[in-house]
């Protein structure tokens, strides 16, 4: 059987009750917490930074998958690693050199995620798949929760799964 992991996003949580919301997810059986970090530059929204993640980390034993929707991402990787991220997920479009950013995350002993926007091509990561622990296929344009699903991403998922099975 597949090892399926449940990783709910806290983007739509009540930020004034974030500690309580995360505790409810932990008690509910989540395997990890997906933290969307937005800078108002790479995406048109602002969320949380390293100090909030560090504070949440003190009260949660679950892994944190920190999805960095910030640019330039490379200069902030270490701050999020130090704050308590277990997985750092980045976008190819947010770095000058994806492989360098991936290697920086690995050097910090964190797992690497790469996120592909609906319009991003799989070719951006094909040659780096052996260095990536997680691929996040965005089924909406990044920046806001509650958007309409973009069905065209299903073909991207099928293509990536086929590539994975051929390795």
Describe these PLM feature segments.
Residues 140-142:
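Short glycine-rich anion-binding loops that position phosphate/pyrophosphate groups of nucleotides
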Residues 163-167:
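Short, intrinsically disordered, charge-balanced linker/junction segments flanking boundaries
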């Amino acid at each position: 059987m597949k090892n399926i992991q449940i990783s709910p996003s806290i983007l739509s949580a009540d930020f004034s009750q974030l500690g309580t919301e995360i505790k409810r997810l932990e008690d509910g059986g989540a395997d990890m917490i997906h933290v969307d970090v937005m800078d108002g530059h790479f995406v048109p929204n602002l969320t949380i930074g390293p100090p909030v993640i560090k504070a949440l980390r003190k009260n949660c034993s679950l892994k944190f998958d920190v999805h960095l929707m910030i640019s330039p991402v490379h200069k902030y990787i270490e701050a999020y690693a130090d704050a308590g991220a277990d997985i750092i997920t980045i976008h190819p479009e947010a770095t000058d050199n994806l492989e360098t950013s991936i290697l920086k995350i690995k050097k910090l002993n964190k797992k690497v995620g790469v996120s592909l926007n609906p319009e991003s091509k799989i070719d951006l990561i094909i040659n780096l798949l052996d260095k990536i622990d997680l691929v996040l296929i965005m089924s909406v344009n990044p920046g806001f929760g509650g958007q309409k699903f973009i069905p065209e991403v299903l073909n991207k998922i099928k293509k990536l799964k086929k590539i994975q099975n051929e390795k």
